[in-house]
Regions:
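Non-catalytic accessory segments flanking enzymatic or RNA/DNA-binding domains
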Residues: 3-158
């Protein structure tokens, strides 16, 4: 679960390696999005286990049922928030469509080993895929976002 500005859909979800996504609310401002997220995080984790993300595709969830359960569980506090902030300040999206994502991965690693360019500036391996911000090599994974400002060279070998 997380906050995504509508102009960043689906870019942010792809960058995070999401297998599925479902918009569930639209709010008037950033502060309200934080308040809604604070409510819902009582029931839904907002952290991703990056190692599990890179071990393969997770079983799909029934996101519509999850959304409906959250709406039922938090109906009163969400309604109170909208009443406090004004009509239309919190719009629950009951009919949004689930979005499924797939990534070009030929083989997921059995054990996750993370490359760190600060500790070892030379990384070699056969590219097995890309998921979110991670390159998956047969020698380990590398978080490209972590090394955004680094200058690298790439050599392709047969």
């Amino acid at each position: 679960m997380g906050i995504t500005r509508h102009t960043q859909v689906p870019t942010r979800w792809l960058d995070q390696g999401a297998a599925q996504a479902l918009p569930i609310a639209r709010v008037r401002n950033r502060r309200l999005s934080g308040l809604v997220e604070d409510l819902l995080r009582q029931q839904v984790a907002d952290k991703t286990n990056w190692r599990a993300l890179l071990k393969g595709d997770a079983a799909p969830l029934d996101l519509e049922a999850e959304r409906d359960s959250l709406f039922a569980q938090f109906a009163q506090p969400l309604a109170a928030l909208e009443q406090q902030e004004g009509p239309g300040s919190v719009e629950l999206l009951n009919n949004a469509a689930v979005i499924d994502f797939s990534y070009p991965v030929s083989e997921y690693p059995n054990k996750i080993t993370s490359h760190n360019l600060d500790k070892n500036p030379l990384v070699a391996g056969r590219l097995q895929g890309l998921k979110g911000q991670y390159l998956i090599l047969d020698s380990g994974v590398i978080n490209l976002r972590k090394f955004t400002s680094y200058q690298v060279s790439l050599a392709v070998m047969d």
